[in-house]
């Protein structure tokens, strides 16, 4: 049995042409692989309140997938949830069709027959940890969340779920870049894979490799599925080049297999951009920084340029709106100061 695994489609109709390019890329993957079933691990939509065009495009994707697969499973991602209430309310429920084997996973669901656990996104990480703790031995987990040590697509938010909580092979959406960790005990060799998006979604992801996965397993036996990661070589992508490198990379930039967002970094020399040689969907022009890090002063004074003394602290405490007395607050301040 072959299962195609893909995640974080982020269907977006706000950029003209992008939604069609996304749908075309996703359907090309399914049509090329012809899997027995598909699993979409969340963030189908870019925005919590998808537009009619985005809803209809996902219906088109599912209708095409159903022609060649026996079942499709779709997890609720954070972008698919109406609010952050963890109540499971999502527009994805519109696509539930058990007669044609489309199952929407709003809350944690265990498939005992296929030995799988599906965990959608929850804002409360304790809910996710509790679900991971209940995973039966040798079951495969599919989820939409991160783990301690990996960051979101903006690179500014870590997650608090330790890898030690992952005791079974796990595939995750939510993280846009491909990465793999080891869960459970050191000698368990439990794979925890963040699959990443099948295409880039912003310039911060420029030049990243995008993947989907194909799992091949025996329905009757209990052996772990065989995993094959496949690189996507079409669809939306973001590229960033300094203007001096445009001419040398025209073949890459103009590759017709991609719907390309090109950012051109312009320096102080204001060299002309060869627009007539570019065949891309969008061009974004941005000025490069005037100074690099080496040109910025690294001055670090040895003495305090400003300090807060006892008088300032005392005046601040006396003005504080607190039921504690000034003497009591100052006593606490001195204890903290002595502790330092």
Kindly label every feature range from the protein language model.
Residues 1-63, 67-68, 130-138, 339-340:
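N-terminal active-site segment of His-dependent metallophosphoesterases
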Residues 3-6, 39, 118, 140-144, ...:
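Structural motif
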Residues 8, 38, 43, 58, ...:
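Divalent metal-coordination and catalytic microenvironments
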Residues 10-14, 46-49, 73-86, 123-126, ...:
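Active-site environment of divalent metal-dependent phosphoester hydrolases
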Residues 58, 76, 80-163, 191, ...:
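Conserved catalytic scaffold of divalent metal-dependent phosphoesterases
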Residues 65-68, 132-136, 160-167, 185-188, ...:
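Short, conserved loop/helix-junction motifs that constitute active-site signature segments
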Residues 151-225, 230:
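Conserved beta-sheet core of the metallophosphoesterase superfamily
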Residues 216-340:
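Accessory, non-catalytic peripheral segments of nucleic-acid enzymes
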